[in-house]
């Protein structure tokens, strides 16, 4: 299993809570970093029920309610019903490095599933499973304790009293639509809660849910 070393020097320690930012520029911005503009990297711990974008015609919660920074865009997606690390930047090359399939950038997820996965199920995840859009790459998959840093979700997950739950640490090297959820369902253990902890060299690193901070490239 590929190991990740997250450097504390990668990130600045100043964090911000900005839950009610009421103004955000509507001016269209290119995803290419303008010349002479320094690279900005924002790490955000996305709460549940927040879209990974700055606008939404349906009036749902978006990034603009939390991040008052213009000209940055999410590197990859993190679904509305998922939580955790979202990396935003104005640097297109960095976005590509984090998200393009050929780069094989590792992404670490902590996943609460229904039931207790068997060794056969874990081996299937590690070796790759065949989904409706083709076989997945081999992945890291291990049964772990509930993370000590875990925050309460609002609203809580729906649990069935007769069925236990457990936590997996899953490392992917690709990024298909709702891939983790589809993989755990494929081996018989549906995902109840999904938190992305790390993406390449960036991690949550004690960043509170709903907060953001600047990092270096």
From Swiss-Prot:
Residues 19-38 are annotated as: Disordered. The active site is at residue 79. Keywords: Isomerase, rRNA processing. Pfam families: PseudoU_synth_2 (PF00849). The keyword Transmembrane does not apply. Belongs to the pseudouridine synthase RsuA family. Responsible for synthesis of pseudouridine from uracil-2457 in 23S ribosomal RNA. This is Ribosomal large subunit pseudouridine synthase E. It comes from Escherichia coli O157:H7. The lineage of its organism: Bacteria, Pseudomonadati, Pseudomonadota, Gammaproteobacteria, Enterobacterales.
